[in-house]
């Protein structure tokens, strides 16, 4: 999946040029991740802390179920949704409650990402434009950050 990070960074650069804004490259800091079963993992807490550090975003809890939205401050558009749900809702076998991240994604990436482990058609969102990612360590923290950055850029206007 090294190619994924390169493709996302290229897309972020293209969108930044369109909007005349600069996006700094992603910092790859291994100290900001938890480790589970020997794998680096970004969980809900680390994701929300990273979003606050990177964008100054405080999570919004519009429902009383613990699910939260990350919004742009200026236009209030969502760029990410973090929720707990039964893995069956993602089309998986099993009955576990899992943390899931929804992000807006570029059409060029979304189809190929859904063929990779940890990626799913977006739950409760437009499946053509949004993607669900399980926060269970299957998807690397760097890929998650890249996709949140892309989603942030795609929802800017």
Regions found by a protein language model. Give the residues of each.
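Charged/polar low-complexity intrinsically disordered segments
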Residues: 6, 17-18, 27-28
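Compositionally biased low-complexity segments enriched in histidine and/or tyrosine
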Residues: 11-17
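Charge-dense, helix-prone N-terminal extensions
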Residues: 28-157
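Compositionally biased regions
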Residues: 10, 22-25
């Amino acid at each position: 999946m090294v190619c994924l990070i390169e493709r996302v960074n290229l897309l972020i650069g293209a969108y930044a040029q369109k909007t005349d804004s600069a996006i700094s490259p992603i910092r790859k800091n291994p100290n900001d991740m938890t480790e589970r079963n020997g794998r680096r993992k970004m969980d809900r807490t680390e994701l929300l802390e990273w979003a606050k550090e990177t964008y100054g975003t405080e999570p919004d809890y519009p429902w009383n179920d613990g699910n939260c939205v990350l919004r742009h401050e200026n236009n209030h558009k969502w760029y990410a949704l973090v929720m707990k749900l039964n893995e069956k809702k993602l089309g998986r076998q099993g009955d576990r409650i899992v943390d899931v991240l929804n992000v807006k994604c570029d059409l060029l990436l979304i189809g190929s990402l859904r063929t990779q482990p940890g990626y799913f058609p977006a739950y409760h969102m437009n499946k053509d434009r949004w993607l669900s990612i399980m926060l269970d360590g299957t998807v690397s923290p760097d890929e998650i950050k890249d996709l949140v950055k892309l989603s942030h850029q795609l929802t800017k206007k």
